[in-house]
């Protein structure tokens, strides 16, 4: 089973909802999805570090600039030598400048799913299990775009 750590910006409802949905959907894809432990005290908790250590992939969908907790989690994942993918909305400034972090920018109005999946496949290798991970990340992007469309129509 592939384990994925999904981080999100706190106080950004769309990102938090997406992370929770992905955690639920992960079971359908036979993926272990972990989220950060952000209950109680601030700072990077041991439980979050353990979840990152267990992960094969670190994933963030960013609709806003990355917050300090997310950047701290990314930095920890770097020290743990994890594959890291940050999927940015085109309107968000990429506030990381770390070559080991794979940043994918998307434009919900212009980009097609093949572009995003192609970028993801550059990061992950080519096994059947990795095809599942790529599909899972694409589902996450679809959910994020759907949430954006829904919020604009309100």
Annotated model-derived regions:
Residues 94-154:
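C-terminal interaction surface of TIR/SEFIR-family domains
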Residues 58-59, 84:
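Short, well-ordered beta-strand core segments
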Residues 1-57, 147-154:
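Conserved N-terminal substructure of TIR/SEFIR domains
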């Amino acid at each position: 089973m592939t384990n994925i750590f999904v981080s999100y910006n706190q106080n950004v409802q769309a990102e938090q909802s997406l992370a929770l949905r992905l955690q639920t959907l992960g079971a359908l894809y036979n993926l272990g999805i972990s989220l950060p432990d952000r209950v109680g005290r601030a700072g990077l908790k041991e439980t979050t570090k353990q979840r990152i250590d267990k992960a094969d992939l670190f994933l963030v969908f960013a609709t806003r600039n990355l917050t300090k907790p997310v950047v701290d989690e990314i930095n920890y994942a770097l020290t743990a030598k994890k594959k890291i993918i940050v999927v940015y909305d085109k309107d968000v400034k990429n506030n990381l400048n770390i070559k080991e972090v794979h940043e994918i920018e998307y434009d919900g109005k212009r980009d097609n799913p093949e572009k995003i999946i192609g970028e993801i496949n550059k990061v992950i290798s080519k096994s059947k299990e990795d095809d599942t991970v790529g599909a899972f990340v694409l589902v996450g992007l679809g959910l994020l775009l759907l949430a954006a469309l829904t919020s604009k129509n309100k």
